[in-house]
Amino acid sequence: MLLLFDVGNTHTTIALTKDGKSFDIKRVSTHSIQTEDELYVFLKMFYRNDFKDIVVSSVVPNINYIFEFFAEKYLNKKAIFVSAKEYNEIIWNVNTPEEIGADRVVDVIAASRDYGKDAIVVDFGTAITIEVLKENRYEGGVIIPGFNMMVNALFKGTAKLPKVELKPSDTFVGKDTGSNIRIGVINTILGGIDYTIERIKSDYDLKSAPIIYTGGQSKLIREYLKKDIIYDLELGLRGIYYFYENIAC
C-alpha cells in the first residue's frame, strides 16, 4: 500500500491506496500536526503500518521535514516529494519548471493520464489555479485569490464589512451586506474563471479540451457548474499516484 499526502496551505489530505483507483482518505488541518511523532500517532489510529512508500505533494515547504523524519524514523524509508523536474512524460514549457507548485504538477499529470493530452484544470484551494495542457505540453497557468482570501481581504481592509461564511446564492443581487459580499465574491471569481477559460480556449486552440474542476473549495460552486465541466475531487491524489508510478519504473 502507498501512503499519499496532499499538503495544502489550509488542509492536508492523507490517502492510502493500492492501485491509484480507490483511496482510503482522511483530512486534517495542515498545521495541526507539528512533529513526526504526532503524525505517527494520528496515522496509527486509522492505518496499519505496512506502507510500501510515502509520497508527498506539498505546497508548504517549511513542514516537509515532518514527512521526511516520519518516513525515516517509522518506516525506514525516504519520503518521495512531487516535483515537475522528476516527471518526464510531460513537457514543462515554462521558464522555471522547478517553481511549479506540487499541487499543480499532480493536477496536470492526472489530467494528462485520465482525460487526454489537451486539458484545462481549475483547482479551488486557498488560492485558485488554472492549468493549461496542450498536446501533453504544460503551457503554464493562472493563479487568483481563493474564496476565503477575498472574504478576508474585504474584512481586514475595511472598517465595517463583516467576515462572512460563503454559501451559494440563487440571486445576483443581495439585500444585506453579508449577501452582497457572498454574491460578489463567488460571482467575481466564477466570472473571472469563465473569461480566462474562454481566452485560453481561443489562444491555444483548446475549444474541445475537457475542463476539470477540483479542490476542496469547489464544493462551494458545484451547483453552478456548466454541463460540460468535469467535477473530479480525487484528481490530485491520482496525480500523486501516477507520479510515483513514473519514477518507480
Curated annotation (Swiss-Prot):
SUPFAM superfamilies per UniProt: Actin-like ATPase domain
Family to which the UniProt record says this protein belongs: Belongs to the type III pantothenate kinase family.
Active site as annotated: 103
Source species of the chain: Thermosipho africanus (strain TCF52B)
One Pfam family from the record: Pan_kinase
Name of this chain's protein: Type III pantothenate kinase
Catalytic activity, reaction form: (R)-pantothenate + ATP = (R)-4'-phosphopantothenate + ADP + H(+)
Cofactor stoichiometry and binding remark: A monovalent cation. Ammonium or potassium.
Gene encoding the protein: coaX
Pathways per UniProt: Cofactor biosynthesis; coenzyme A biosynthesis; CoA from (R)-pantothenate: step 1/5
An example molecular function term from Gene Ontology annotations: ATP binding
Enzyme class (EC, first level): transferase
